[in-house]
Amino acid sequence: MGQIFSRSASPIPRPPRGLAAHHWLNFLQAAYRLEPGPSSYDFHQLKKFLKIALETPVWICPINYSLLASLLPKGYPGRVNEILHILIQTQAQIPSRPAPPPPSSSTHDPPDSDPQIPPPYVEPTAPQVLPVMHPHGAPPNHRPWQMKDLQAIKQEVSQAAPGSPQFMQTIRLAVQQFDPTAKDLQDLLQYLCSSLVASLHHQQLDSLISEAETRGITGYNPLAGPLRVQANNPQQQGLRREYQQLWLAAFAALPGSAKDPSWASILQGLEEPYHAFVERLNIALDNGLPEGTPKDPILRSLAYSNANKECQKLLQARGHTNSPLGDMLRACQAWTPKDKTKVLVVQPKKPPPNQPCFRCGKAGHWSRDCTQPRPPPGPCPLCQDPTHWKRDCPRLKPTIPEPEPEEDALLLDLPADIPHPKNLHRGGGLTSPPTLQQVLPNQDPTSILPVIPLDPARRPVIKAQIDTQTSHPKTIEALLDTGADMTVLPIALFSSNTPLKNTSVLGAGGQTQDHFKLTSLPVLIRLPFRTTPIVLTSCLVDTKNNWAIIGRDALQQCQGVLYLPEAKRPPVILPIQAPAVLGLEHLPRPPEISQFPLNQNASRPCNTWSGRPWRQAISNPTPGQEITQYSQLKKPMEPGDSSTTCGPLTL
C-alpha cells in the first residue's frame, strides 16, 4: 500500500575521490571487456582497492598498472585482478609517440595554408583498444562516433532527463573520451533527444556562441568562418574544447522533463528501510531536476513528508523535521519494522510416482491427491445398488414424484444435476457419483461414470444396437471385453458393398491374416444405459461371423466400469502333490559333529506330535479365493524317496 519500488542506481559508477576522470575511464573500459560482464560487487571492490592504492601515489605519476597490480593483496575479492591484467596488456600494445620534428630555419618555412580550408583528417595508424589510454598529461585523440557507441550512450541516459546531473555526467564522460567535433556533437544531440529539445538546445547554443565570439576566444579567427566550422578541424583542439563547453552549457537552459509524474508519489513502504527510501528520492531528483537546481531543500522536505508514520514520529521526537539529511538518516538508522516476515517452513514434496493411481489409473500423482471420487467398496446395504454409498442412498432421501418415461425410450445416462440437495449423513467425507435416476425428456442428460453390474456365473454379455450406415440397425448380443483394443462385429451386419481392408490381428491363438477385416466407415453403437450412441471411426469385421465384442475403444467413450459381485461358494478340497525333489541336493551334507548340546527330553513332544497320523483342518470360508495347504511334519526326504503328501486345499 503506497509502496514504490526503488529504481536501479546510476549505471556509471562514480570514481573514487582523488582519482582523475581519464584514469577512471580506463578502469571502466577494462571492466566492461570482462566476459561475463562486471557486477556492482566488482565495481565496489575496485573502488575500495583504489582508495587504498591512492595512499601510495607512486604508480600514478606516470600511471603504471604493473606497479599497481603488485599492490593488490593475494586473494582479493572481486575481479580486480582481471581488470588490471587487461590494462597491463593494453598498455603494452600502445606504441610510443614519435618525437616532434626539430624546428626548421626561417629560410625554409613552408608557405602558410589557406585559413578557409581545414587540413584533411588523418586516421591514426594504430587504433587503440581503450581510447582514453594515453600518457599522463597528453590530450585524448579524436574518434568519430560508431553506431554501437551511440546505442551505449543512449542506454545509459534512457532513465534521465536532458540536463539532469546523471545525463550531464554521462555526456561529459563521452565527450572527454571521444573528443567529438561540432558535427559529431550535432549527430549525438539528434540521436539522444527529441526534435523539440534539439531545437531549444540549438537556440541556446547560438546565443552562447554569439556571446563567446563577442567576448573573444583564444585561437578564434573571424575570417576563417564561424566557430562551428573551425571546431570541426581536428587540429584546432583549443577551439574544439571551447565549443564542447558551450555545447554542454546549452543544456542548462532546458526545462526539466522528469520521467516521474510527481515526486510526491514516492512514498516509503511500511517495511522499507529509511535510507533506501531516501536513495530512491535522490535518484528521482537527479533524473528530473535540471543541472544547477538546488536539490537539498526538496530532498529534505520529501524525506520527512513522504516517510511512513513511524519514521515521522522518530524525526518529530528528535527535532529533525527539516534538519540536514545526515541527521535525519542517523535518527532513523536504528528503526526496524515491527511486522516481521513469517518464515514458512515448507516440507519438501516427494517426486510424483511412476506407478498408476489406485483410484483413476493415471500416473503422475498419489492416490490421496486424486480428483476422482472414491468408489464404494461394495453394494449399498439398503438397496444393494453398487453405484453409491449408504449416505447417498435414495431411501434416506424424500421421494420426489417423477413422470413416467416413454415406453420405447432406452435407459438414459446418469444425471449430474440432482433436483434436490444432497443430505450427507455423519458429515463430510468423499461423495460418490449420483444415483441411477431417470432424467426428464426435456432435460439434457450428461454422461458420468456408469457402473455395469454383471453376473459372475455368466459371460459378460450385453445387448447393443449396431448401425453400420449401410444397412438397417440391428440388435445383437456383444461380449464386453476390456482386453480387446478394438471392437469386433460380425460381417453379417454389413452390406456386401461395404469397403473392407485386409489387416493382421494378434490374438491368443496367434497372428491371423485373413480372419478379420478393417472397415473405415463410421459405426454407431447404442447401449442400454446411454441415450447418445457411441461413434467408432473404424472397427474389426469378423468374416466368419463368430465374434461380436465391445472393446476398449467403445468402453472408453462411455467411461464404463464393469462390476463383478463376489459369489459365495462352498470350499472345495482338492489333493495336491508335494515335489519329490526339493532342489537343495547340490548343497554339501551338514557335518555330523555335534555342535550344540541337545536335550533329548525336550524333543520328545515334537517327535510324538510328528508321529501322529494325517490331520485335516477346515478353515472358515472367506470371500475371494484363498488357498490353505496342510502337510505332515516328517523327517527330511532322502534321495530317491518318491512318497507323496496329500492335504486339503481350500478354494
UniProtKB/Swiss-Prot annotation:
A motif (PPXY motif) lies at residues 118-121. The active site is at D481 (for protease activity). The record marks L130, P131, L344, V345, L449, P450, L574, P575, L582, G583 as: Cleavage. The keyword Lipoprotein applies. A lipid is attached at G2 (N-myristoyl glycine). It holds the Pfam family zf-CCHC. Coiled coil: none annotated. Residues 476-554 form the Peptidase A2 domain. Keywords: Aspartyl protease, Capsid protein, Eukaryotic host gene expression shutoff by virus, Eukaryotic host translation shutoff by virus, Host gene expression shutoff by virus, Host-virus interaction, Hydrolase, Lipoprotein, Metal-binding, Myristate, Phosphoprotein, Protease, Repeat, Viral nucleoprotein, Virion, Zinc, Zinc-finger. One of its GO terms (cellular component) is viral nucleocapsid. Its EC number is 3.4.23.-. PROSITE patterns: ASP_PROT_RETROV, ASP_PROTEASE, ZF_CCHC. Residues 93-142, 631-651 are annotated as: Disordered. InterPro entries: Aspartic_peptidase_AS (IPR001969), D_retro_matrix (IPR003139), Gag_p24_C (IPR045345), Peptidase_A2_cat (IPR001995), Peptidase_aspartic_dom_sf (IPR021109), Primate_lentivir_Gag_pol-like (IPR050195), Retropepsins (IPR018061), Retrov_capsid_C (IPR008916). A motif (PTAP/PSAP motif) lies at residues 124-127. It is an enzyme of class 3 (hydrolase). The modification Phosphoserine is found at S105. SUPFAM superfamilies: Acid proteases, Retroviral matrix proteins, Retrovirus capsid dimerization domain-like, Retrovirus capsid protein, N-terminal core domain, Retrovirus zinc finger-like domains. The keyword Zinc-finger applies. GO terms for molecular function: aspartic-type endopeptidase activity; nucleic acid binding; structural molecule activity; zinc ion binding. GO terms for biological process: proteolysis; symbiont-mediated suppression of host gene expression; viral translational frameshifting. A zinc finger (CCHC-type) spans 355-372, 378-395. Residues 641-651 have a biased composition (Polar residues). HTLV-1 lineages are divided in four clades, A (Cosmopolitan), B (Central African group), C (Melanesian group) and D (New Central African group). PANTHER family: ENDOGENOUS RETROVIRUS GROUP K MEMBER 24 GAG POLYPROTEIN-RELATED (PTHR40389), IGE-BINDING PROTEIN (PTHR40389:SF3). This is Gag-Pro polyprotein. It comes from Human T-cell leukemia virus 1 (isolate Caribbea HS-35 subtype A) (HTLV-1). The lineage of its organism: Viruses, Riboviria, Pararnavirae, Artverviricota, Revtraviricetes.
